[in-house]
């Protein structure tokens, strides 16, 4: 019987940065569908809206999306800015060249979005951003790697970090394993979706990681379906 007391340290298939082809395209399409149906996108959108509303005089935003995948969430976040009568420029980062090409095509109609092929853990960022966002991305790292990345992001984030990631729980694990086994056409999704849950974090683990990285001001909220929404302020409480 699988236990969930500790994070699974197994690598996901998609952690191979050289993987490419139709299987990856199918994986990205299905992930977008899963996030839309299970409300995953709304977690990031709601967090960004909270940050934007807390700065009513600011009308232009620079936003980075780490591990951006298809880029779909940047399109959704841009709608939030427009609803708040703001403008924005988005930079998506992914270390897989094939995924970068996919995202560039997916976001081609939005001139405010650019996609860069970059390893965010090891490569320098080109600029400072108002908001740095990461959805379903940070569970790919070990706790030590994540601390290093968060320390690095302190210097790159002017206002807030927004994190949307998985809560490690048996119900979430077996539910997504059953759903993807039944409906998914992607061997990547069938393997990686449940493993992602097993690699997710408990709330207490997030607190430990943030404290190790030197963050004092943050809000962590559990959100359906088995996600944590984090809004982190690197330099102040707002």
PLM features per residue range, with description:
Residues 219-238:
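Core SAM-dependent methyltransferase catalytic element
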Residues 141-152:
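A short, conserved alpha-helix within the catalytic core of class I
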Residues 158-166:
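Conserved beta-strand signature within the Rossmann-like core of class I S-adenosyl-L-methionine
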Residues 21-47, 51-52:
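Class I SAM-dependent methyltransferase Rossmann-like catalytic core
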Residues 166-213, 219:
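C-terminal alpha-helical "lid/dimerization" subdomain adjacent to the S-adenosyl-L-methionine
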Residues 133:
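A conserved beta-strand element that flanks and buttresses the S-adenosyl-L-methionine
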Residues 64, 70-72, 77-122:
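Class I SAM-dependent methyltransferase SAM/SAH-binding core
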Residues 1-30:
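N-terminal, positively charged/glycine-rich alpha-helical extensions of SAM-dependent methyltransferases
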